């Protein structure tokens, strides 16, 4: 057998960008494992409780970029996922840290202070869906991290104490390339923002919150016409009359703009103002513009011939989607959200989805909230778009059958998984029986994430999926009849999966205990409304579990579980 020198192996590994590929080569042999761990610069931890921070740093002593994911989407408030242990471990073992990305974690101001004071050379801080910190923490980061290129607060809950943090970035100029504070709910110091933009010549991505006035936006665009990504501010604040012409002129000079979002409180009046940038847009997010009439939306979208990603509200209607399908033939991702999240009705149906699939045959990803669906429509979509890697369909009435025949939607979803060989993410809704799970287990060979609700007849349905989907990583099931037999039937698969979420199913405490006794590398967390359960009390074994979260770990049971969680 021929062995490559370490330098050659390290050089080869340098061409592997994905975490999946790096993980795979580390399993080839001990020598490759050693070279890979010493040369790894970027690490992704998909579950903050899957491994201890100290162990991650011990394995990868040379890492420069760390990404950690926290709580799952469905867990109750107070579940955990504190960022402090991870930041403290970085301080102790990773002096060269340059990038930190945290998702759905609890980040305090003290945590941000520790981070900023310990890593003055930090270049990128991304906090997605995080909470627990305020603008005081942001001020500390801006003051101390003088080489910051990216600060992204996407969908985080930030306590607004004041807006002085915008004035804390280094003077006379910054290295900022990307700034996202669209999630902030408080007022923004407009003069400080304008000065910051003026001092950031490398700025290419800017996402403002809804308190930034229209006239300020116009001046920002005039100052930085080479933006590539923009989330606009408010369209109803500031000197609107005076800013209208200025904004139109500013957009005319934004020839590099590719991604546009925001449109906070925008009305149909302002759509023509944005028209100059239509021809170059590849990403357009209109999900925050409920007051723009569909006719104006359609007219605007039709001018975006290069569009690859489109997010809209369902008031665009089936007719609007048909026009989009004929105009945006390069479309690769479509998301249609309900304009009224509390409504059980929608203005889009299966007709809009079929039209999009017919006109946009490059479509790879769909998230579609609709009023009704049919098997024939899904079969047609499957034939038109075999490139799907992500297909998420939400029928607003979760138990809805085929709107024409009254049959379950099994055959339609079966066509999706059979035609779309590269499907990795699937979300189902509507009236579904065990048959759809049989199809998924038979045909969805590459499926990694599956989310279902109000589906199935017996334990067989879940068993079909666990036995058939060898690449499954995440399984989320809500309000379905699966019980202990289905749970225990998947033991062979759980070692390879990242997590399993079950809520309002038929699993009992006894089933959870049986699984825990057989699989020591799993954390099995039962979430109760009351205090923790006495594990030794067998009288509780027949009680159904309301919420269950199972995940693979090499760290053992966590020490910060709140009282409403019992770990087996």
UniProtKB/Swiss-Prot annotation:
Domain notes: The F-box is necessary for the interaction with SKP1.
GO (cellular component) term, any one: nucleus
Ranges for domain F-box: 1-45
Keyword set, alphabetical order: Auxin signaling pathway, Nucleus, Ubl conjugation pathway
Entry-linked PANTHER family: F-BOX/TPR REPEAT PROTEIN POF3, TRANSPORT INHIBITOR RESPONSE 1-LIKE PROTEIN OS11G0515500
Cellular localization per UniProt: Nucleus
Top-level lineage group: Eukaryota
An example Gene Ontology molecular-function term: inositol hexakisphosphate binding
Name this protein carries in UniProt: Transport inhibitor response 1-like protein Os11g0515500
Biological-process GO terms, alphabetical: auxin-activated signaling pathway; protein ubiquitination; SCF-dependent proteasomal ubiquitin-dependent protein catabolic process
Additional remarks: The myo-inositol hexakisphosphate acts as a structural cofactor.
Site residues, Interaction with auxin-responsive proteins: 155, 369, 478
Biological or metabolic pathway of the protein: Protein modification; protein ubiquitination
Annotated segments matching region Interaction with auxin-responsive proteins: 338-343, 394-398, 453-454
Assembly and interaction partners: Part of a SCF (SKP1-cullin-F-box) protein ligase complex. May interact with auxin and auxin-responsive proteins.
UniProt cross-references to InterPro entries, sorted A to Z: COI1_F-box (IPR041567), Leu-rich_rpt_Cys-con_subtyp (IPR006553), LRR_dom_sf (IPR032675), Transp_inhibit (IPR041101)
Cystine connections: none
SUPFAM superfamilies cross-referenced by the UniProt entry: RNI-like
Protein source organism: Oryza sativa subsp. japonica
Binding site for 1D-myo-inositol hexakisphosphate: 69, 103-104, 335, 390-392, 425, 473-474, 498
């Amino acid at each position: 057998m021929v062995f490559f020198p370490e330098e050659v192996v390290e050089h080869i590994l340098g061409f592997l960008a994905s975490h999946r590929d790096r993980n795979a080569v580390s399993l080839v042999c001990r020598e490759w494992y050693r070279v890979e761990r010493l040369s790894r610069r970027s690490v992704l931890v998909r579950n903050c409780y899957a491994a201890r921070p100290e162990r991650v740093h011990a394995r990868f002593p040379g890492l420069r970029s760390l990404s950690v994911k926290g709580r799952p989407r469905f867990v109750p408030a107070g579940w955990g996922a504190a960022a402090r242990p991870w930041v403290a471990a970085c301080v102790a073992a990773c002096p060269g840290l340059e990038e930190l990305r945290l998702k759905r974690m609890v980040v305090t101001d003290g945590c941000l202070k520790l981070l900023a004071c310990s890593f003055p050379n930090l270049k990128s801080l991304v906090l997605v869906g995080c909470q627990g910190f305020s603008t005081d923490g942001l001020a500390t980061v801006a003051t101390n991290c003088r080489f910051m290129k990216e600060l992204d607060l996407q969908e985080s809950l930030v306590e607004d104490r004041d807006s002085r943090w915008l004035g804390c970035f280094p003077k006379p100029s910054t290295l900022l390339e990307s700034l996202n504070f669209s999630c902030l709910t408080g007022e923004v110091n407009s003069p400080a923002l304008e000065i910051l933009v003026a001092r950031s010549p490398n700025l290419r991505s800017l996402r403002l919150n809804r308190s930034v006035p229209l006239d300020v936006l116009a001046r920002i665009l005039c100052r930085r016409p080479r933006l590539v990504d923009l989330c606009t501010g408010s369209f109803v604040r500031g000197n609107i009359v005076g800013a209208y012409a200025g904004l139109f002129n500013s957009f005319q000079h934004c020839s590099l703009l590719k991604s546009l979002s925001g449109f906070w409180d925008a009305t149909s009046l302002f759509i023509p103002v944005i028209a100059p940038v239509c021809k170059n847009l590849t990403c357009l997010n209109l999900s925050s513009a409920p007051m723009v009439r569909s006719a104006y939306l359609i007219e605007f979208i039709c001018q975006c011939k290069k569009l690859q990603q489109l997010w809209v509200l369902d008031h665009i209607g089936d007719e609007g989607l048909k026009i989009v399908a004929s105009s945006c033939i390069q479309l690769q991702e479509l998301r249609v959200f309900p304009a009224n999240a509390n409504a059980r009705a929608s203005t889009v149906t299966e007709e809009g989805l079929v039209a999009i699939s017919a006109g946009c045959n490059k479509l790879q990803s769909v998230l579609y909230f609709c009023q009704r669906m049919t098997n024939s429509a899904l079969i047609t979509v499957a034939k038109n778009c075999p490139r799907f890697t992500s297909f998420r369909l939400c029928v607003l009435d979760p138990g809805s059958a085929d709107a024409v025949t009254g049959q379950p939607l099994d055959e339609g979803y079966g066509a999706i998984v059979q035609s779309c060989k590269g499907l990795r993410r699937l979300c189902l809704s509507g009236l579904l029986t065990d048959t759809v799970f049989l199809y998924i287990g038979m045909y969805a060979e590459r499926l990694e994430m599956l989310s279902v609700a109000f589906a199935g007849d017996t334990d067989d349905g879940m068993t079909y999926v666990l036995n058939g989907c060898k690449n499954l990583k995440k399984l989320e099931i809500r309000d379905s009849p699966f019980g202990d037999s289905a749970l225990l039937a998947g033991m062979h698969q759980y070692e390879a999966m990242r997590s399993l979420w079950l809520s309002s199913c038929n699993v009992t405490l006894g089933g959870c205990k049986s699984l825990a006794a057989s699989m020591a590398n799993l954390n099995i967390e039962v979430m109760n409304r009351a205090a923790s359960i006495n594990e030794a009390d067998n009288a509780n074994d027949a009680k159904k579990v309301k919420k269950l979260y199972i995940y693979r770990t090499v760290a053992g049971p966590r020490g910060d579980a709140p009282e409403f969680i019992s770990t087996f």
